[in-house]
């Protein structure tokens, strides 16, 4: 044959020697993925009895959610498709937050593949759109649940609300640095956006085809939303100018400020100095917590890059003022300290070091009664011992970082606050469980 002639001159290859015991080919269990199986699944056995997901369900099942259930239109003996139970959606987002899942699409995929989420769902199918809408639509509920949970922990004696600590963290906004525009550029973009909206409206009216109309209408909606964002950015520019003028009147430095810019992606975001020393679009998340127990008492979101002057707004929103209030040096403001002193709150905040090397604990001529008491308090050994508990509140931010609260996926201050409330309530559930076990 041709093959024999082709390889006739090659040397003979040595054949593998067969062992004397003739064991043969090894037998192994290999996957067969084209087979069809019928399995009996016990959903409750998917997770262990001490699994974290059961803690969140035990918390949710005991809540009064009538304010959400009353909105459901599908009723007994009436037509209509029943929606997903609000209790289930609440539990899904609480557990997902503790696992660092902040995307509705990712959560919807996990509900199909991950045992813990499948156990929560219990055979109920969920979609990402419902999950995303629920996450942003229940801010009032989260505020109430946070307050009720803190009150329950205080009533049980697990936390002491007489001493609170405040700390802030900058969280990266969902906006790029290139989206910040000056006033002239915003005006030019607004004219272009309005012209595009008018053109698309005319095209929609002229095209009789339904499919073409839908495409044109979608393009018109996108152009209209862009025009609205540019208008919001112009309003943000006016706010920035007013804030700069107010600061210049209080503390003139003689320097000509740079021309302000606002983002067309998220007009409420501001460029702030981050923890690594860089400047990026971000929000300032303020957290008031029980000093030492890592329990969040209140949260607030603002777009001010400095913590100075943010102590009083946080104290004003607390239902009951604490006896002691611990903050870091960035919150040190004489006006806030005087106001807190008038309300019976002792502020523990390290004074800023003087450029001239003078003792910051010595009284000064323009000090009020509150500032004088604060300097004496922080200069004493007892005051320094009280202040040591403040550093524990930073563990809350570290925990949130581990849960992937590094860059926001939503835009606007209201939605950012909703996301922060999810993190705060999740933190309190886990820390409250820890405190109860340690008691």
Task: Locate the predicted segments by residue.
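Short, compositionally biased low-complexity segments
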Residues: 25-35, 118-121, 201-205, 371
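Bromodomain acetyl-lysine reader domains
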Residues: 114-116
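Short, flexible loop/hinge motifs at secondary-structure junctions
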Residues: 1-44, 57
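A general alpha-helix detector
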Residues: 42, 88-94, 130, 148
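Anion-binding and metal-coordination hotspots
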Residues: 1-14, 100-112, 124-439
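Basic, short loop/linker segments at the boundary and entry of helix-turn-helix/winged-helix-like folds
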Residues: 47-94, 99
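A ubiquitous short alpha-helical element
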Residues: 24-28, 75-79, 381-384
